[in-house]
C-alpha cells in the first residue's frame, strides 16, 4: 500500500523538468509579442500571425520532445519503485497469513501489469506534448491578436498593450489541455495529475493482481486527513473485491475504483491493503472523525485539513502566477517591479498561513523554472530558431547528397535512440570504424530508415550491393519498433548517400 505522503512526492522530479519547459515557452511567447510589427494592415497581420503561431508551435514541440527520453526513464523508475513499495507491505500481510507470494520478477502477470502501466502513462505524456502545442499555440494567437487590436484601434498605447497581454498570458500559464467547457489545465497541473494517477493506478493494479494470485478478497482502504469530501465517505473501510461478501460492502461500487472520480482516479492518493478476518483495523471511527474535524484556523476561520490544503494551493498558485509574470516581462525587456513586489507579498502571505496552520511548505508547488534576462532570452530564441530550421525538413547539398544534421562519427559508443528529432539524419561508425551507418528520422522524430555502407560483418545475412551496402526500413507498431527488414538501396538512396558509399 502506498501512503499519501509517498504519492505527493512522486511527481517532484517530473514537475521540475516541465516547469522549466513551461517558463521557456512563456518567455518565447513574450519575446515574440514584444517584437511583433503591429503597424501593418489587418490582412497582412492575419498572415503574419499565423506564421508566428506556426513557429511557436514548432518551438513548443521541439522543446517538449527534448524531455521525452528523460521522461520515459523517470516514469519507468517511478513505476518500478512504487510497485516494489506497494507489494512489500502487502506481501508482509500475506506471509503472516501463511501464504508465500513469489518475487515480482517471477510473476509474468505482475510484469505485464507493470509494463502496461508504464506504457499507458508514457502515452499520456506523448499526448501531452501534442495537446500542449495545440492549446498553447491557440493562447498565443489570441494574445497576439488582442494586442494588435488594442494598439491599432487606439484602445491602448503600445507599451500598455504589450504589458497587458504578457500579464494575461502569465496569469493563465502555458495551457496543456483545453476542455470543451473552456477550462484549461496548465502544464504543471497536467504533469502532476498524470504522474500521481499513473503511478498510483499501476501500483493498485499490481496489488489487485497479487490479491488474485493469493486468493484474497477483502481489502482495507487507506485514510488520511485532507481527503476530498466524496472520498472521505468511504476511506478507512473494509470492502469485498468480488462484491460477494455478505458482511462487507462491494469495493468497486462503494469506492468507484477504476473510474476517474473514484479510488485511484484523478490525483487520488488513496490505496488499499489486503485484509483478513481476525486482523486489527488501522482506522477506527474516532480517527476517521478526527480526520474530518475543523482542526485548522486561519485568520479566525475554522477549517478542515482539506479546506486548509485548498487555501494553501490557492496561495501557491498566486506565487507561481507572479513569478511567471516577472520572468516573462524581464524576457520581453519590460519593467517587472510590480511582479517582484507581488512575489514578496504572496511569499509573506504564505509564511503567515503556514505559521497559523502548522502546515508545511512544498517548494515544487511554487517553482516556475529559471527566468532569463532580455539579452539571454533573445540569444536563446535565436538558437531555438536555428534549431527548428535545422530539423524542419530534409535538406540537400548542391550535389544531391543529403545534409547530415548530426555527425557522431567522432563519438565513442554513441547511442542512436529510437526517437530523436524530426527530420534528423545521424551518422555513426560501426565495425571498428570500417562501416558508416546513417539513420533517418521521420517528421515525428522516430527512426524511419538506416543506410549502411557494409554488411555488419555478416555478408550472408546482408548479400546486397557491391560491398554489402544496404538499407533497413524501420517498422513501428503501437509505439514500438517491431521489425527492421533489410533491402537493396534504391537509385535515389545511392545518389543522396553517395558521400558515404
Segments and roles (model prediction):
Residues 1-164, 287-413, 448:
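N-terminal leader/targeting and assembly helices and adjacent pre-domain segments
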Residues 279-280, 328, 480:
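Intrinsically disordered, low-complexity acidic/polar segments
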Residues 284-293, 486-491:
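Short intrinsically disordered coil segments
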Residues 123-214:
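Contiguous, non-catalytic segments that form substrate-binding/exosite surfaces or channel walls
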Residues 101, 105, 111-112, 203-210, ...:
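Intrinsically disordered, low-complexity boundary segments flanking structured domains
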Residues 325, 395-501:
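Catalytic toxin/effector domains delivered as secreted proteins or via bacterial secretion systems
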Residues 185-288:
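Acidic, glycine-rich two-metal-ion catalytic cores of nucleic acid-processing enzymes
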Amino acid at each position: 500500500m502506498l501512503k499519501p505522503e509517498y504519492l505527493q512526492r512522486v511527481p517532484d522530479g517530473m514537475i521540475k523538468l516541465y516547469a522549466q519547459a513551461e517558463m521557456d515557452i512563456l518567455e518565447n511567447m513574450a519575446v515574440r509579442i514584444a517584437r511583433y510589427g503591429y503597424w501593418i494592415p489587418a490582412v497582412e497581420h492575419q498572415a503574419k500571425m499565423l506564421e508566428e503561431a506556426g513557429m511557436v508551435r514548432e518551438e513548443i514541440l521541439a522543446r517538449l520532445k527534448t524531455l521525452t527520453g528523460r521522461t520515459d526513464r523517470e516514469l519507468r523508475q517511478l513505476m518500478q519503485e512504487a510497485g516494489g513499495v506497494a507489494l512489500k507491505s502487502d506481501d508482509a500481510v500475506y506471509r503472516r497469513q501463511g501464504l508465500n507470494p513469489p518475487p515480482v520478477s517471477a510473476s509474468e502477470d505482475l510484469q505485464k501489469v507493470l509494463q502496461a502501466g508504464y506504457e499507458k502513462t508514457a502515452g499520456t505524456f506523448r499526448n501531452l506534448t501534442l495537446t500542449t502545442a495545440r492549446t498553447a499555440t491557440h493562447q498565443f494567437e489570441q494574445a497576439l491578436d488582442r494586442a494588435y487590436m488594442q494598439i491599432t484601434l487606439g484602445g491602448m498605447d503600445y507599451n500598455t498593450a504589450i504589458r497587458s497581454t504578457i500579464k494575461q498570458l502569465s496569469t493563465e500559464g502555458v495551457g496543456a489541455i483545453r476542455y470543451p467547457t473552456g477550462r484549461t489545465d496548465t502544464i504543471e497541473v497536467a504533469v502532476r495529475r498524470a504522474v500521481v494517477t499513473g503511478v498510483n493506478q499501476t501500483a493498485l493494479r499490481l496489488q489487485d493482481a497479487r490479491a488474485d494470485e493469493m486468493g484474497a478478497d477483502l481489502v482495507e482502504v487507506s485514510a488520511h486527513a485532507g481527503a476530498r469530501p466524496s472520498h472521505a465517505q468511504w476511506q478507512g473501510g473494509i470492502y469485498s473485491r468480488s462484491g460477494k461478501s455478505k458482511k462487507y460492502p462491494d469495493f468497486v461500487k462503494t469506492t468507484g475504483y477504476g473510474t476517474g472520480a473514484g479510488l485511484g482516479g484523478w490525483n487520488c492518493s488513496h490505496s488499499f491493503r489486503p485484509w483478513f478476518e481476525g486482523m486489527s483495523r488501522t482506522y477506527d471511527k474516532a480517527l476517521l472523525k478526527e480526520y474530518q474535524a475543523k482542526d485548522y484556523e486561519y485568520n479566525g476561520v475554522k477549517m478542515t485539513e482539506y479546506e486548509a490544503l485548498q487555501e494553501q494551493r490557492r496561495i501557491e498558485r498566486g506565487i507561481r502566477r507572479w513569478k511567471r509574470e516577472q520572468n516573462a516581462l524581464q524576457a520581453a525587456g519590460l519593467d517587472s517591479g510590480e511582479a517582484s513586489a507581488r512575489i514578496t507579498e504572496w511569499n509573506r502571505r504564505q509564511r503567515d498561513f503556514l505559521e497559523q496552520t502548522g502546515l508545511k511548505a512544498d517548494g515544487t508547488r511554487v517553482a516556475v523554472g529559471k527566468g532569463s534576462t532580455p539579452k539571454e532570452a533573445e540569444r536563446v530564441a535565436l538558437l531555438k530558431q536555428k534549431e527548428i530550421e535545422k530539423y524542419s525538413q530534409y535538406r540537400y547539398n548542391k550535389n544531391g547528397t543529403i545534409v547530415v544534421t548530426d555527425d557522431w562519427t567522432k563519438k565513442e559508443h554513441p547511442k542512436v535512440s529510437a526517437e530523436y528529432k524530426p527530420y534528423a539524419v545521424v551518422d555513426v561508425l560501426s565495425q571498428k570504424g570500417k562501416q558508416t551507418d546513417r539513420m533517418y528520422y521521420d517528421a515525428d522524430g522516430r527512426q524511419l530508415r538506416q543506410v549502411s555502407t557494409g554488411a555488419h560483418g555478416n555478408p550472408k545475412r546482408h548479400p546486397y550491393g557491391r560491398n554489402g551496402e544496404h538499407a533497413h526500413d524501420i517498422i513501428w507498431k503501437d509505439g514500438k519498433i517491431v521489425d527492421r527488414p533489410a533491402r537493396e538501396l534504391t537509385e535515389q538512396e545511392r545518389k543522396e548517400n553517395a558521400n558515404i558509399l
